[in-house]
C-alpha cells in the first residue's frame, strides 16, 4: 500500500517517528482502551504492544506515551526464551508500566484453536502471572496467530476477558483484505507496515483503527531491520554481562567488555 505521509522529519522506527504518529492519531481519534469499546462505539483507535524481546524498550515506549497522555496495553509472555517477566528487574519494569496507567495482558500461543483449550491455557497463565506480579490481568493477545488462523476465525469470547482479536476490535478475512474495512488493522510486524502506515489515516475514511506495535523494533535512533537487530543484540549482551557481574564477585567484567568491544 502506498503512503502519503512525510517521514523526512524523523527516522523510521525511531521514537521521534512514534511521537509523530501519536500526535497525528490524537488529532483524529480518541485513543481509548479496549474496555471502553462496545457495539455502539462509532469511532476509535486502540494501540497495543506485544512484547517479544525487550522489556526495557517497552518501558521507554510506555514513558513516551504517558508524556503524551496516551494509554495503551502491554502484553507479556510468561514463557519467552529471551526475557523472564518475573526477574526482579523486569518485575519492576512491568510495575512501572502499569503505574503509568497502561493496561497489562498476556501474550501467548495456544496449543489448539479449540475454545476450551484456549480458555484453559489463558487462565493458567493468568494465575501464574497475577500470583508473581500482583497485577490484575483481564486481556490477552495471540502470538503469531498467522500460523494458526483458525484461532482468529473463531472469534473466541471469554466472559470478563478481552480478546484483542475478537470481532469488536478486529475483522478476520479468509482472503484479500479490503481497502477500507470497517476496522482497520495496522501492524509493524517484521519492521514493515504491510497493512498501511498509521499516518495513512490522515487521508482515509477509516473510523476504527487497531494498531499493533512491537517495542523491540523501536529505538532512539531508529533504522532498518538489520540495524535494529544489531543494536538489540548489543543491548541484550550488555544486560547479560551486567547480570553475570552482579552474581559473580570475581567476574572480570572490564576485560570481557574490552574483548567484546574489540570484536
Model-flagged regions — what are they?
Residues 1-73, 77-89, 98-100, 111, ...:
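Terminal accessory/targeting
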Amino acid at each position: 500500500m502506498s503512503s502519503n505521509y512525510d517521514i523526512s522529519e524523523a527516522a523510521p522506527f525511531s521514537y521521534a517517528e512514534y511521537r509523530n504518529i501519536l500526535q497525528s492519531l490524537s488529532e483524529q481519534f480518541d485513543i481509548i482502551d479496549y474496555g471502553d469499546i462496545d457495539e455502539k462505539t462509532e469511532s476509535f483507535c486502540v494501540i497495543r504492544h506485544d512484547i517479544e524481546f525487550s522489556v526495557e524498550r517497552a518501558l521507554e515506549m510506555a514513558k513516551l506515551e504517558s508524556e503524551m497522555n496516551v494509554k495503551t496495553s502491554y502484553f507479556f509472555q510468561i514463557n519467552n526464551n529471551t526475557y523472564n517477566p518475573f526477574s526482579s528487574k523486569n518485575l519492576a519494569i512491568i510495575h512501572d508500566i502499569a503505574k503509568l496507567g497502561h493496561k497489562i495482558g498476556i501474550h501467548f500461543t495456544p496449543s489448539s484453536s479449540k475454545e476450551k483449550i484456549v480458555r484453559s491455557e489463558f487462565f493458567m497463565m493468568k494465575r501464574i502471572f497475577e500470583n508473581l506480579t500482583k497485577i490484575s490481568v483481564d486481556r490477552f493477545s495471540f502470538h503469531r496467530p498467522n500460523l494458526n488462523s483458525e484461532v482468529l476465525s473463531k472469534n473466541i469470547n471469554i466472559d470478563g476477558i478481552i480478546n484483542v482479536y475478537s470481532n469488536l476490535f478486529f475483522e478476520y478475512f479468509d482472503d484479500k483484505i479490503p481497502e477500507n474495512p470497517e476496522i482497520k488493522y495496522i501492524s509493524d510486524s517484521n519492521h514493515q507496515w504491510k497493512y498501511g502506515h498509521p499516518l495513512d489515516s490522515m487521508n482515509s475514511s477509516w473510523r476504527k483503527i487497531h494498531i499493533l506495535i512491537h517495542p523491540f523494533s523501536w529505538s532512539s535512533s531508529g533504522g532498518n531491520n538489520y540495524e535494529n537487530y544489531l543494536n538489540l543484540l548489543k543491548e541484550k549482551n550488555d544486560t547479560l554481562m551486567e547480570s553475570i557481574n552482579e552474581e559473580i564477585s570475581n567476574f572480570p567484567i572490564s576485560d570481557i567488555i574490552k574483548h567484546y568491544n574489540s570484536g
